[in-house]
Amino acid sequence: MSSSCWLLLSLVAVATAQSLIEEKAESFLNKFNQEAEDLSYQSSLASWNYNTNITEENAQKMNEAAAKWSAFYEEQSKIAQNFSLQEIQNATIKRQLKALQQSGSSALSPDKNKQLNTILNTMSTIYSTGKVCNSMNPQECFLLEPGLDEIMATSTDYNRRLWAWEGWRAEVGKQLRPLYEEYVVLKNEMARANNYEDYGDYWRGDYEAEGVEGYNYNRNQLIEDVENTFKEIKPLYEQLHAYVRTKLMEVYPSYISPTGCLPAHLLGDMWGRFWTNLYPLTTPFLQKPNIDVTDAMVNQSWDAERIFKEAEKFFVSVGLPQMTPGFWTNSMLTEPGDDRKVVCHPTAWDLGHGDFRIKMCTKVTMDNFLTAHHEMGHIQYDMAYAKQPFLLRNGANEGFHEAVGEIMSLSAATPKHLKSIGLLPSNFQEDNETEINFLLKQALTIVGTLPFTYMLEKWRWMVFQDKIPREQWTKKWWEMKREIVGVVEPLPHDETYCDPASLFHVSNDYSFIRYYTRTIYQFQFQEALCQAAKHDGPLHKCDISNSTEAGQKLLNMLSLGNSGPWTLALENVVGSRNMDVKPLLNYFQPLFVWLKEQNRNSTVGWSTDWSPYADQSIKVRISLKSALGKNAYEWTDNEMYLFRSSVAYAMREYFSREKNQTVPFGEADVWVSDLKPRVSFNFFVTSPKNVSDIIPRSEVEEAIRMSRGRINDIFGLNDNSLEFLGIYPTLKPPYEPPVTIWLIIFGVVMGTVVVGIVILIVTGIKGRKKKNETKREENPYDSMDIGKGESNAGFQNSDDAQTSF
């Protein structure tokens, strides 16, 4: 037999073997898909029941269902790992096997997996049920929704906002801190068991694209793309930041620096994530009709169902399907009125078996109107790829899923669309001023959130990479917040806080960079769909409603799910494989030009040195080694606790003696910032009754003077080694300048007199006697009998007059 025949037979044998392997893999996946859909549905349903009725019983049922799903998935993942991907040529089979070979949290031991689930459930419960109570009326308590969110959305009372902001972080963030520390350790262990460097790397793996030549994308490219696009966006953000700062100075004139960062609690919501609610305070042209149509919705008696029905009409108008009957039956579109505790944060659910739902405590506002479009966009994506195999039912990447609803929101927010549904009057006329009003409102929501999103995820990536030590998490959080976002903490926080976890997405284990990438994608999609809709004019005026051409182009992409690389899906819609920020910048170009003109006499950018509490802070310097030598002790958290307690004692004494008031100051009312290793720091004091009431620095100084000796004794130091800068030491007279004007005049007069006396008696008095006589003239205490000595009580050791602390 010739060599060519042997070669042909070999190729046939290889092809046959390969075909058998693929048939076996396909059979395995078909069986998996059927079983997975049933178990996944049961787990998702139990999770839905818990999120819409938070009880111990429902938590237990959710954990049991999740454990069954996890055990099944772990078993199937191990079987999938027996298939060599190199032997699989069918792209669809290969993609499913690769996904299944990633075992997720099942890679942990059963005990650690159970521990992780318990931590996640506990964090979710703390977040969803956390309350902030009024210290003056402990029965008056506020949930986040409804309650605190309303204060942060509408109040212009600086102190009330600060009370809500601090209360949420003190009550919820502090509880989450130890749990979040465990969460980071376990999630990193899980990620490394799945061959990722850390959990941040695991999240970025969602953006990997491979298998199709020219469309590859690795997870490290995501970091580069985010960094580069942020540099392009930053000039627009800086202009917006400067404009908002100027406007907030008009509302809070005593609390804003014209060159500094913005206080975090003044930015429209609990986190400063979206600045949408700042629009009433920052509207450029107030004489124009209000493009926030909340009042019109209320006046027309809109309710939650009307909001979602209107969103559905939008999707149907571009050729996408209606919601299923089960959607309207099973969704939770308003907060229950039966005292159930629920997770109000808006989310879209694809439970499986064609069961699609939305959970949202809808309010009749324009913001919620747009949120409804966003959440229904998720459902449209879910329905579009429902026919894909179970493992490919997902967005091309996580940012795509978030972008779909945002595309519709861009159109739904336009004055043109709002007029068409009767929320703006038919005689509403668009001009340059209404255009700027509209674009500013859009920018407060879209541009204002980008640095927030970028910075939060960068911080988490660094935490997962162990680049930020655990004992510096909060410190680094606020350093990055100041530097990147231009936002400052209104009160200093130590490492007992977990401010990042006070946001739903952090405490509930969501990747967050999706909200950054989605913003880039949504404008790329919008530009392409507007071209399909044959829109003529600026991008910000485009409304794609009623364009089935645009809808079909979008649907073609949605139906792919995760069956191919996202770079290919992006190219199919926009003609490019890469994230591109230019459509976003083009959308806001008229606003950018206007902002630069408005800010021509203002500082653009920010200094990171200023803080709202700086003026009332006192600086402390402590010199342990120079004072105690070999006996010097280390300045630890315990020493700082003792210092804060001693200041609280001084405040109690001061208010008791000087004001005849009993005020229960505690160490928690003494706030420390800018702690340096050598040791120095700043501190100020707030009222125990109201954290937003900062005690004037002058009163704190008086309290320190009154108890200075006691404080020194506590630490074994003195006025020179425990320095309160700006407070004169109390164990010696206050410092006075050596030369003053009155003393100069007095000296001239006395000098003339002395000269006359000297001339008269110079021949009879010796030089030394003359010198002593001159000193006597200048010494008001010369009459005292120094030999006896007189005790000055003001210079006695404080221990003689007071008991030790």
Swiss-Prot record:
The Collectrin-like domain sits at 614-805
Q: Matching Pfam families, A to Z? A: Collectrin, Peptidase_M2
| Protein name, as recorded | Angiotensin-converting enzyme 2
- Per the record, the covalent cross-link Glycyl lysine isopeptide (Lys-Gly) (interchain with G-Cter in ubiquitin) lies at 788
What are the binding positions for chloride in this chain?
Answer: 169, 477, 481
Which one GO biological process term can you cite for this protein?
Answer: tryptophan transport
Where in this protein would one find the motif Endocytic sorting signal, according to its record? Answer: 781-784
- Cross-referenced InterPro entries: Collectrin_dom (IPR031588), Peptidase_M2 (IPR001548)
The Polar residues compositionally biased stretches are: 793-805
Q: Which pairs of positions does the record mark as disulfide bonds?
A: 133-141, 344-361, 530-542
Essential for cleavage by TMPRSS11D and TMPRSS2: annotated span:
697-716
Q: Where is this motif: PDZ-binding?
A: 803-805
List the Extracellular topological domains. 18-740
| Signal peptide positions on this chain | 1-17
Q: Which organism is this protein's natural source? A: Rattus norvegicus
